[in-house]
Amino acid sequence: MPLSSAPSVSTGFASSVIFDLDGTLVDPAGAITGGIAAALAAHRVPVPSQQVLDSMVGPPLLTSLKALPGVTQENVASIMDHYRSSYLNSGMAASKVYPGIRELLQTLGEFGVARAVATSKPEPLAHRLLEVQGLAGLIDSVHGSHPDETVPHSGKTEIVAAALSAVGADGVDEHQRRDRVVMVGDRIFDVAGAHAHGLRCIGVTWGYAPEGELEAAGADHLAADAAQLADLLQQLLGLSSSLRSALA
């Protein structure tokens, strides 16, 4: 349903939702952290604690790897290749869509709300993950980092900017944009990327943020499950029909 024909969306409220991917729509279910650990071990690099591994879900992987003891300019590319190969071969399929997310995306589309993804994952991998998880048809545009992870990396602010352009919200003033677009993510980077463009951000607590991170980052709202997220989106987007009912 095109945006212009959606009677459920009130003019002046958000008409788009920008979602993070890993930890927000899809649970890597250990595919990312386990894959990183295996790649490090294969290169005889010390494997960090689970807490550190969890913190690597969200930000650019190359940046996170370079911060680890034992990762050098000489071995980082090989570690990345090892991880990516494992992720493509088995990690994507092992990932799982969070409960209620598929139904929520479907209903947002039926209400005429544009659904974009803004992720630090390389864009081709993001497309592939959405296809493998059966979500590709429920997302209107996908925005990620450069496929070559050795080139300067686009930050979340730049990736959100690309999503805003895709949904047609880059040409409106900040007040209108704030009323029409909502960001949803699980890490500090999502909150910062949203606020850099004057957007409200719903932080989902089922992802990979350490305790207190989303609150400290200034997330405008918090959702503990898809039902709470549905209620918040209904309120912020000014929808006249219930999103929560689609999750039953």
Describe the residue ranges of each PLM region.
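Active-site neighborhood of HAD-like aspartate-dependent phosphohydrolases
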Residues: 2-55, 69
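Metal-dependent phosphoesterase signature
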Residues: 66-103, 111, 173
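Acidic, Mg2+-coordinating phosphoryl-transfer loop and its flanking beta/alpha structural elements
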Residues: 183-223
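Helix-loop "lid/cap" segments that line or gate small-molecule binding pockets
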Residues: 39, 60-74, 129, 159, ...
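Substrate-recognition "cap/lid" segment bordering the active-site pocket of phosphatases
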Residues: 123-182, 188-196, 211
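Short, acidic loop-to-helix structural element flanking the phosphoryl-transfer center
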Residues: 7, 12-13, 89-117, 123-127, ...
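Structural recognition of alpha->loop->beta junctions
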Residues: 134-144, 213-230
